[in-house]
């Protein structure tokens, strides 16, 4: 079995509940984290609403009217990570405002380059975990995973997982039911996909790290800006 020690993973929780309020998404994050930690992956969870991340599309929002912004420091932790998992609840069939804020701040630094001249997130692996009621897991995952790949994260197979309750008001993931069991804990679909996602994230991150990442051929913004065209032919001159 591969040795995953040395890998780092960050889970961002887009819950709208400030600590110490209960986050159902945290419970699903814990399922994935425990698998990673059993295999030597260093993990941390950042609850976006409590993190001090300002709203905006600039790398440091203190330069644009905000009194404080912790994103520059958190961004350094993202750069040091191999795996980034964007997690959160569904509200009105969509990702929460805190989840969207995180995506916007990742986008704010999307122009940064790594030491190969590639976009900064090129050799990092992305995934997502979603919790909610009624509907929306696939819609939310679609938005998140599209955004991550657009920012150059590598998305492995089965990179999303989630749980949905029944339509209408009812228990959320992890809530205690009348019989003493916990809602969602017995869902084979959720448990299987969360496990597969976690392992695929680790496998892909390990492959990228051991190989030195994707070659900087045909994907270096630095080289493109320097005039390289990587066999591109302008159709106007064919």
Predicted regions and their residues:
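Short alpha-helix boundary/capping motifs
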Residues: 64, 154, 172, 176-177, ...
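Short, glycine-/small-residue-rich phosphate/pyrophosphate-handling segment
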Residues: 23, 115-170, 189-192
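Intrinsically disordered, low-complexity segments enriched in small/polar residues
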Residues: 160, 168, 178, 224-225
